[in-house]
């Protein structure tokens, strides 16, 4: 047997190797349906997931992407308590009704109230007694000119003619009550005057401004959180679930591993009611193993990211388009969606990833330069950049991602074997601006393919192209005089 016949088992193609073939279409880009699944039970309005990277997704990013209709995965390079706090921030950022509002006891002081307002970034707090009955409400206006920090809340709160509603009131009626009485916060009480929730004018306004937001059944923004495979994985998961996380992502460099599969089984036993997504993988065989172990979603991508060096350092990987297609074939009929993670440079790559069988795409470098990313802002040669690093970079591994690459027992930094780099990306403005262009490109691609929704896009066909075809696809034989918001020359 020859080496090629015996050892080469597949052709590996990535996004630049193919183009989608246009088809007869009765679909206009503006009419396509972009809703999809993140995991078995979590639906998205747009197929975009921000990566669990410490220069990409914390609460600010997760809030922003959820408001656009996607979901963010908060990274794990922080303490359990801090990651849970980040999740809680997202869950409190927007509500239909806040079911567990921050409250203060009637015997508390002005200082206590101000501390709570500062901690939770809120402008008003319901005041309750020991039985949780509503006795008043205190707002910034009540405290603005108060100098005695030890004064009891009872003496400064609003306690007369408090406007309330009951849990059965619909949002349209609530909006009318808020406008009629010119108030911003409406306590929700039961028949015994016990506080059961709080509705704010700000949340109603946000819901109207962002009708496509990705929300749970209680009207709260959805958020996922990443965990590794460590001794404290279950402790971290419990804290995240208690904080309100909608899904957990077991995030490793090699998801087709005995240790990952065992941890997944253990996690599903402890937390049967929450969706658990597992990655990363690159083969159909890996997908089948994870689904059999209980995965509610899988993440595909071994080395395609711009800051990942796994393929060079370890010599391992599968070009991303082929990996997505192979996993998609294996998952057919299971009801388990896949996330195409990495290798995306243009909106056209998103269309290709979804056409190959993806249900959503995970984006890192595309959003790392946005205002909402936690990366450090840098000025270089008069231009603004933000830091962006792989979770396999030395810098990230020092901060907690060693376990992702199965090196958690290595304490000496010099003995770590990195599989990523630290870099910088141009500042890109707000996440909304980036997502707007990505969604626009996706809609255009679906229109060309005649695909009214993502499921139909899975039926699209590809043509393989040469290097000359790649060059022809990009602007050529000209000097660009005005940059487009959705294109830059490949480096």
Question: What kind of region is each of these model predictions?
Answer:
Residues 67-82, 245-257, 296-314, 344-378:
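Glycine-rich phosphate-binding active-site loops on the catalytic face of alpha/beta enzymes
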Residues 60-63, 235-243, 282-300, 340, ...:
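Catalytic cores of alpha/beta
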Residues 30, 79-88, 146-150, 194-214, ...:
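Active-site-adjacent beta->alpha loops and helix N-cap segments on the catalytic face
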Residues 1-24, 104-105, 166, 226, ...:
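Alpha/beta catalytic cores of nucleotide-metabolism and tRNA/nucleoside-modifying enzymes
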Residues 43-50, 96-101, 216-226, 267-282, ...:
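Short beta-strand/loop segments at the ligand-binding rim of alpha/beta enzyme cores
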